Amino acid sequence: MITIGILNLQGAVSEHYDITKKAIENMGIEAEAISVRYADEVANCDGVIISGGESTVIGKIIKERGIDKVIKDNRIPVFGTCAGMVLLGKKTDFDQPLLGIMDISVKRNAFGRQVDSFESPISILGEDYLGVFIRAPSLDDYDKTKEDIKVLSKLDDEIIAIQQGHNIAIAFHPELTDDTRIHEYFIEEVLNCVE
């Protein structure tokens, strides 16, 4: 059985929890979704989801609690949405603590402020999907020399989803839809990692 930890610090935590449980049910696998807040809890997870919220605050808490060290030391796969995307990168356009486990540079609030939030049809993993964008970041750049990096989706010319190894960073909020496919994809990555 695998354990997917939803980092319960800020953002759409309950929505991520609910859709992760639904994805697990749809996949018919032995797995559980749990809420995690501390490093010792994260250490017991096979994968971690970092939701949206204020990336500066989440980054500070992750560092203060040693969650970043546990994730890095145990090579735990991470799925970051919105602020989670910012935190996964090694660089951003703002001085803040980062998890820095992906060779990407992220631009915060690239699609505007809260009032500029929108939904848009996108294609991800070769399938149609509805992207929900709320103060969404975008990818500024990534290390094109890394063979384990793949772009998963773009909106116009902006990269909005990228994967490196078993880590996935996306700019939008799949937890605010009823569509479990992206969460299922992450869970598959976790399964591939623990096998």
From Swiss-Prot:
CDD domains named among the record's database cross-references: GATase1_PB
An example Gene Ontology molecular-function term: glutaminase activity
Assembly: In the presence of PdxS, forms a dodecamer of heterodimers. Only shows activity in the heterodimer.
Active site residues per record: C82 (nucleophile), H173 (charge relay system), E175 (charge relay system)
Species whose genome carries this gene: Methanobrevibacter smithii (strain ATCC 35061 / DSM 861 / OCM 144 / PS)
Protein name per the record: Pyridoxal 5'-phosphate synthase subunit PdxT
SUPFAM superfamilies: Class I glutamine amidotransferase-like
The enzyme's E.C. designation: 4.3.3.6, 3.5.1.2
